């Protein structure tokens, strides 16, 4: 093999490489510089950006041999003598990252941008030049701010450093940033074990086909191939199907059952398809080899004999009695057919209505696309029978339990470890087939097995989201009061009956935060020959809020009401709360009117007419929209925190959530700083390893901070109570004479005190202590919270459309979101920005396109799936409302999903408003230039 030599981060390196070795592979696999990430394999995402001879390049599209003799700088080499580069400092100071997976590429691209274009960069220039870099978390708002500040600092400007306290309510800069901005994070593909081998999946090219035979002989003879495993091996070894949990597990969520009393259809989802492939990308075999290249070569030689069958992909088509059946065991593709609400009361209300507004829509299928592709390493210890899985997910404990079920072994023999996780959004919320496969394969071959998903593979194998067909009606009286709503929702579960919770959690808030006395909906779930769907950010709520907000705008237009006044008339007032909506959900509290009024001011609704007139003079159409929302935050109700105060000056918190970009290492530490009075740098949050995390529901459904705050508070109070008794012994007084404040136990009326860490030392050193005071100063709180939380808010969006091109530009976006009590406003704002971007992305850009005849995914790469980029957005105007929730002991509401929930509705409301002069009543999502242009042309012809 040829030898390549180059200088990397100031060091001369050389190695023998295959001719097909890419620069990114050389950096990661030969030099172990894992800060350079691979996010797409097609040079579309920018995660792999490095500098070659001082110029930014995408290392996934450059051969290592092409860099022979070159000077290469990676993110690990950007800091000099331990001092952060100004651009790294700026990303930290301006919260320019969340999960951190795209961040090294962003920073390297930003430095290159400054080197090419100078230090005086405006936002428009930055957004345009950053179009080659993707971020799924941030919405780019803070990234652009960071690059502006970093560019100035590279020219010598002083970087502002935020100072102040580190307790609740402070915009503390994130602790985890320092490893992520320097390339020292540890994502799943960064994990490598001694003697590991590599897995590649053989996936079905058919949307629906019977598997007749699999020939593995040629693959087994391929150099480097160690094993080829099929469903026959899987079944012989006793592997079980994925233990799906189809419905939301929280007691507060509504229950859905088939109206005819039959069981809800549930199909076995094996990690390798044993009889039929039911969607393009379903794994049918696995090749294990010494190298990834050898495994890929072997996979090409696996011969699978298929008998193609008719496929069905469309949601409504799948519900028809004569549709091709995805599962032979079922009588139809409808696996759930439920009724919710009051049919009779709703019918009576419609009978007396002065106005009835109808709306039919399909909320298209999208995919979460975390920037980190999935990866997993499985290991097996034959001596102990212990399995270990290294993989990113939303929670280690749930993954461990599900993995043990699939492997058919006791949970005690399974360990799950996860480090940094590059985005979640619901896509990582459940176990995947490959996680069980690598653990099983490790036992079969006697060596650790690693699998890394390529992006094109992720598009067909990652769980997808949304895909809801809706028919809805809204009844109003002559004055515009809402009387009732009714309709039908059909959710597309994909090929497997994995999860109906988006359908369930959506329909339960179909009426949103409006006064709707009666409602009735039919809720159905169907299977189809498409990738399985799961909850995607805000699971089911963006779809139904979209429907409700479109109904209101349609009603205003059809019946002659003002859009804002119609909302004011029907929004619930604070005096009406708590309020039971027509589906049985109890909204605890909220200043719904106040939040909408704030959003209208923030979005400058009052002066919109002037901006519209100015746009018309330029031949453009300008529109504005408003949307109100409520979320139901439930999720797994149980969480536990174990808090230990160490005498050497550290507080450890063990908890079952996992940060996938939310900043738990910082915001959870702020809680401890507030309540125990210790410096934030002395608090360590420990998660993601089932060797020490024994209980926890993970991070989903807005449960992270909501439940963590409760159990950390309880544990902190226990520590203070225990510490008070210990301090009394140390100070030789009564516990009633002790007061705890700012990390110290002090005697009242005197100057004697002892610090928290000294008390912890005393607990370990004192003799003759009561039994309950002996040992470490520690406490544990294990709570099950059976009440839901209802974050809410109001968003205003303004768009400008070129009617000749159909192009839509979001020119303003304002959001007011109520979070009850904000722990870290900086982090929350970042969460809102990212949520908005994902919602706007669905409204204008994103869709999983399937060929209806074959089930082929036609949008299977970043070249085909239109992801939001930096130049798709303006800066966002965001504001937090803090009305304490009475159902949370600290008044908190979740904040991670609210940005997405109203975004679909507010954007399309603005688009339709912009096209009002053309008589356009609705534009389906995504409102692409072609779709908007066709709406303009069709209505221009109609109206002459």
Listing of model-derived features with the role each one plays in the protein:
Residues 1-161:
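Signature of N-terminal electron-transfer/Fe-S-associated modules in redox systems
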Residues 66, 78-79, 234, 393-396, ...:
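Acidic, glycine-rich active-site loops and adjacent beta-strand->loop/helix elements
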Residues 95, 170, 176-179, 250-267, ...:
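Glycine-rich loop/linker segments at domain edges
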Residues 151-331, 356, 444:
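Flexible, low-hydrophobicity surface segments
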Residues 179, 300-313, 394-396, 401, ...:
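Extended active-site and interfacial segments that coordinate phosphate-rich ligands
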Residues 231-232, 251-254, 262-263, 408-413, ...:
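C-terminal catalytic domains of large/alpha subunits in multi-subunit enzymes
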Residues 346-407, 624-650, 655, 662:
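Conserved beta-alpha junction segments in alpha/beta enzyme cores
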Residues 424-446, 450-452, 664-672:
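Thiamine diphosphate
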């Amino acid at each position: 093999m040829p030898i390549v030599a180059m200088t990397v981060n100031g060091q001369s390196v050389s190695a023998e490489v295959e001719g097909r070795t890419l620069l990114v592979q050389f950096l990661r696999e030969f030099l172990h510089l894992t800060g350079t990430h691979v996010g797409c394999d097609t040079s579309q995402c920018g995660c792999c950006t490095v500098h070659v001879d001082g110029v930014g390049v995408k290392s996934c599209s450059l051969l290592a041999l092409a860099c022979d003799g070159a000077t290469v700088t990676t993110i690990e080499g950007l800091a000099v003598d331990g001092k952060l580069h100004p651009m790294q400092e700026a990303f930290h100071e301006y919260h320019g990252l969340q999960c951190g997976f795209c961040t090294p590429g962003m920073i390297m691209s930003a430095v290159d941008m400054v080197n090419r274009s100078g230090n005086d960069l405006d936002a428009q220039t930055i957004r345009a030049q950053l179009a080659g870099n993707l971020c799924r978390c941030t919405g780019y708002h803070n990234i652009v701010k960071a690059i502006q500040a970093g560019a100035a600092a590279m020219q010598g400007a002083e970087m502002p450093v935020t100072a102040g306290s580190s307790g609740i309510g402070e915009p503390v800069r994130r602790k985890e940033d320092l490893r992520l901005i320097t390339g020292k994070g540890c994502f799943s593909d960064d994990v490598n074990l001694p003697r590991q081998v590599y897995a590649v999946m053989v996936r079905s090219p058919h949307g629906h086909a019977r598997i007749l035979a699999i020939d593995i002989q040629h693959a087994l003879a391929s150099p480097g191939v160690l094993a080829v495993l099929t469903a026959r091996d899987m079944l012989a070894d006793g592997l079980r199907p994925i233990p799906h949990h189809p419905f939301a597990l929280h007691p507060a969520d509504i229950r859905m059952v088939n109206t005819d009393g039959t069981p809800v259809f549930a199909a076995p989802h094996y990690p390798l398809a044993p009889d039929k492939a039911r969607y393009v990308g379903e794994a049918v075999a696995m090749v294990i080899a010494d190298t990834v290249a050898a495994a890929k070569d072997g996979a090409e030689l696996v011969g699978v004999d298929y008998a193609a069958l008719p496929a069905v992909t469309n949601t409504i088509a799948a519900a028809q009695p004569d549709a091709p059946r995805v599962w032979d065991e079922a009588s139809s593709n409808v696996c759930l057919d439920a009724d919710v609400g009051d049919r009779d009361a709703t019918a009576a209300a419609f009978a007396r209505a002065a106005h009835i507004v109808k709306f039919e829509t399909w909320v298209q299928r999208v995919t979460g696309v975390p920037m980190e592709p999935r990866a997993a390493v499985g290991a097996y210890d034959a001596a102990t029978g212990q399995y270990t899985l290294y993989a990113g997910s939303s929670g280690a404990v749930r993954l461990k339990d599900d993995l043990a079920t699939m492997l058919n072994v006791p949970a005690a023999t399974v360990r799950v470890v996860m480090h940094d996780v590059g985005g979640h959004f619901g896509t990582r919320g459940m176990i995947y087939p490959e996680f069980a496969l690598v653990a099983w394969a490790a036992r079969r071959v006697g060596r650790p097995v690693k699998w890394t998903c390529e992006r094109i593979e992720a598009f067909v194998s990652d769980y997808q989201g949304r895909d809801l067909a809706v028919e809805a009606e809204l009844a109003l009286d002559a004055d515009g009061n809402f009387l009732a709503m009714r309709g039908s929702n059909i959710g597309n579960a994909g090929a497997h009956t994995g999860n109906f919770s988006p359908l369930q959690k959506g329909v339960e808030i179909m009426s949103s935060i409006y006064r709707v006395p009666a409602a009735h909906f039919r809720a159905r779930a169907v299977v189809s020959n498409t990738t399985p769907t799961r909850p995607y950010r805000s699971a089911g709520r963006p779809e139904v809020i979209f429907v409700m907000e479109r109904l209101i705008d349609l009603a205003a237009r059809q019946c002659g009401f003002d859009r804002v006044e119609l909302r004011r008339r029907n929004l619930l007032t604070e005096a009406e709360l708590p309020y039971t909506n027509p589906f049985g959900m109890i909204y605890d509290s909220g200043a719904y009117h106040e939040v909408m009024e704030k959003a209208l001011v923030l979005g400058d609704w009052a002066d919109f007419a002037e901006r519209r007139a100015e746009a018309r003079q330029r031949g453009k159409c300008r529109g504005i929209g408003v949307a109100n929302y409520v979320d139901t935050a439930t999720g797994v109700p149980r969480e536990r925190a174990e808090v230990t105060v160490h005498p050497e000056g550290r507080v450890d918190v063990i908890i079952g959530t996992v940060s996938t970009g939310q900043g738990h290492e910082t915001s959870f530490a702020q809680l401890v700083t507030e309540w125990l009075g210790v410096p934030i740098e002395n608090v360590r949050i420990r998660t993601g390893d089932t060797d020490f995390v024994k209980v926890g529901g993970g991070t989903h459904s807005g449960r992270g901070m909501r439940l963590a705050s409760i159990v950390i508070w309880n544990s902190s109070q226990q520590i203070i109570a225990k510490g008070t008794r210990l301090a009394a012994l140390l100070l030789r007084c009564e516990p009633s004479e002790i007061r705890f404040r700012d990390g110290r136990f002090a005697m009242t009326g005197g100057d004697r005190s002892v610090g928290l860490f000294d008390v912890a030392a005393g607990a370990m050193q004192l003799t003759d202590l009561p039994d309950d005071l002996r040992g470490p100063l520690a406490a544990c709180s294990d709570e099950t919270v059976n009440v839901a939380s209802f974050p809410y808010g109001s968003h205003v969006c303004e768009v400008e459309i070129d009617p000749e091109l159909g192009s839509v530009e979001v020119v303003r976006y304002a959001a007011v979101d109520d979070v009850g009590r904000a722990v870290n406003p900086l982090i929350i704002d970042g969460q809102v920005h990212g949520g908005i971007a994902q919602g706007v992305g669905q409204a204008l850009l994103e869709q999983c396109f399937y060929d209806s005849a074959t089930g082929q995914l036609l949008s299977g790469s970043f070249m085909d799936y239109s992801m939001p980029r930096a130049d798709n957005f303006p800066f966002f105007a965001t504001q937090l409302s803090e009305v304490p929730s009475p159902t949370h002991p600290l008044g908190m509401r979740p904040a991670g999903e609210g940005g997405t929930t109203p975004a679909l509705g507010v954007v399309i409301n603005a688009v339709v408003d912009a096209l009002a002069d053309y008589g356009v009543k609705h534009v389906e999502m995504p409102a692409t230039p072609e779709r908007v242009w066709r709406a303009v042309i069709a209505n221009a012809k109609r109206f002459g």
